[in-house]
């Protein structure tokens, strides 16, 4: 319950009279006001605390702390890609950029963590929320959130295109595709973010992270994001359908067993061989890229779910005549109870998205980095770090890889180490090695002057427990076989003529 103050003016409690506040500063479009007679009455800021209650902020903070725990996993992958050799990480520019996008995506990492330490003020005054122009924290967190969404969706689309080209069209991805993907994957999110910030902007709407404003959000952000996500999903499903088609074709195609003779024929089915080769090639590609395919499907499903949820939230909270008519019983309840939110919560639940759905979006946003770590943190990465630290501190085999076996003989008197010469013993010369190189006379008799091969016949020494002896070749010199009888006869079919 709220007490009356001078800012209520002629409006019933808990509403505040709009003309008692300055017309500039903060996000004016974020005010929730409705004309009542000759005045305009507004709900206090933040609006979410009235529609969902103060408990939503505590639950949203739990999702933020999940991101705090998952952020080191994302950083661990990026550091591994940068430090370890590729034989341990199997890094690829698609995976690296994808991981960078996930670190930014929907504030699941940095954008949720920064507000935990800063604790920005969500409201510019009692009825106006802060936006990117009045709050630096709002501009930073909102930009990271929306840039992460752009990057993840665009790189999901590029990974799907690469997978489709490799599987369905047998295209070998070279430098042209790499540079094209890098340009497309970074320029499109940058342009999309710039256009969105200029035309729409971000402001505090719920929680400590700024989200895109309602006006213009659909055409400036959600429609392009959903378009890329749906295109990636359709392309991914088409690729998987092609894989299933090739697999079924290789199972049920029996043309290779229709010949009556057991001998191979020149007229074997080329179509059967091609189908089986295509299946083996696709299987190899799937074995290499199943992690990326799985993560792309998870990301696309989450992005579509997020988009639908936020669009529903925008449509329900947008101050339109239809929404005001739906919210009229709730507004009347607040005026009758002097702003008792608990008593009016059943009326608010009739027009707002469910609280569980909104919290599910925040938790899923935080878990995206966890799925990325589970799928891309190969066991070889941990072996690579063990090898890295062993070589770093001199306990691994890599430190002795280029040490010569006779390095000790290059030194003089090794007893000088640790002051062993202080005993006064005379130094003795090390004995010369007993192994000597073959003499030129011996080497001259073992090589042929024509071609340098060994020309002397080796004398056969039969072992004591052997019952075999050298035998001359049994086959006569010259060709004793007819090549015509060793090849399979040609088989002719009626449709070959």
UniProtKB/Swiss-Prot annotation:
Q: Does the keyword Membrane apply?
A: yes
**Keyword annotations from UniProtKB, A to Z:** Cell membrane, Glycoprotein, Membrane, Transmembrane, Transmembrane helix
Q: What happens when the gene is disrupted?
A: Leads to a strong increase of dihydroxynaphthalene (DHN)-melanin production.
Membrane disposition: Multi-pass membrane protein
Q: Does the keyword Glycoprotein apply?
A: yes
Q: Which residues cross the membrane?
A: 66-86, 98-118, 138-158, 179-199, 221-241, 293-313, 357-377
Q: Which residues form a coiled coil?
A: none
Record note on quaternary structure: Interacts with gpaA.
This molecule's function is given as:
G protein-coupled receptor that plays a role in conidiation and regulation of the biosynthesis of secondary metabolites such as dihydroxynaphthalene (DHN)-melanin, via interaction with the G-protein complex alpha subunit gpaA.
Instruction: Return the protein name.
Output: G protein-coupled receptor gprM
Q: Which organism is it from?
A: Aspergillus fumigatus (strain CBS 144.89 / FGSC A1163 / CEA10)
């Amino acid at each position: 319950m709220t007490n009356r103050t001078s800012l209520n003016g002629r409006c019933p409690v808990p509403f505040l009279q709009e003309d008692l506040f300055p017309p500039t500063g903060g996000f004016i479009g974020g005010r929730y006001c409705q004309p009542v007679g000759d005045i305009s009455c507004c709900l206090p800021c933040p609006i979410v605390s009235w529609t969902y209650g103060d408990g939503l902020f505590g639950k949203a903070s739990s999702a933020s702390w999940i991101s705090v725990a998952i952020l080191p996993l994302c950083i661990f992958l990026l550091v591994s890609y940068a430090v370890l050799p590729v034989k341990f990480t199997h890094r690829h520019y698609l995976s690296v950029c994808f991981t960078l996008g996930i670190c930014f995506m929907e504030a699941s990492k940095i954008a949720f963590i920064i507000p935990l330490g800063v604790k920005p003020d969500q409201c510019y005054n009692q009825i106006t929320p802060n936006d990117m122009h009045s709050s630096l924290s709002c501009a930073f967190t909102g930009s990271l959130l929306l840039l992460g969404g752009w990057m993840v969706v665009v790189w999901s689309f590029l990974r799907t295109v690469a997978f489709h080209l490799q599987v369905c069209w047998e295209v070998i991805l070279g430098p042209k595709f790499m540079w094209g993907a890098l340009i497309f994957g970074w320029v499109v999110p940058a342009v999309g973010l710039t256009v969105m910030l200029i035309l729409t902007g971000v402001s505090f709407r719920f929680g400590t992270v700024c989200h895109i404003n309602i006006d213009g959000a659909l055409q400036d952000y959600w429609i392009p994001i959903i378009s890329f996500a749906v295109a990636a999903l359709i392309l991914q499903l088409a690729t998987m359908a092609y894989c299933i088609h090739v697999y079924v074709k290789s199972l049920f195609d029996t043309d290779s067993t229709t010949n009556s003779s057991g001998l191979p024929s020149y007229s074997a089915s080329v179509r059967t061989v091609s189908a089986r080769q295509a299946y083996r090639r696709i299987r190899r590609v799937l074995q290499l890229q199943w992690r990326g395919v799985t993560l792309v499907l998870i990301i696309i499903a989450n992005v579509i779910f997020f988009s639908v949820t936020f669009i529903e939230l925008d449509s329900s909270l947008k101050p339109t005549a239809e929404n005001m008519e739906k919210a009229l019983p709730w507004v009347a309840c607040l005026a009758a109870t002097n702003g008792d939110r608990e008593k009016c919560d059943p009326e608010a639940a009739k027009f707002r998205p469910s609280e569980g759905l909104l919290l599910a979006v925040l938790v899923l946003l935080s878990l995206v980095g966890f799925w990325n770590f589970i799928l891309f943190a190969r066991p070889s990465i941990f072996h690579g770090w063990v090898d890295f630290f062993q070589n770093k501190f001199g306990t691994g085999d890599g430190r002795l890889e280029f040490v010569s076996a006779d390095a000790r003989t290059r030194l003089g008197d090794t007893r000088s180490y640790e002051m062993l010469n202080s005993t006064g013993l005379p130094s003795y010369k090390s004995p010369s090695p007993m192994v000597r190189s073959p003499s030129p006379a011996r080497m001259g008799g073992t090589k042929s002057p024509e071609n340098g091969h060994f020309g002397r016949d080796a004398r056969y020494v039969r072992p004591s427990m052997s019952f075999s002896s050298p035998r001359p070749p049994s086959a006569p010199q010259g060709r004793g076989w007819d090549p015509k009888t060793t090849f399979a006869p040609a088989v002719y079919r009626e449709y070959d003529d």
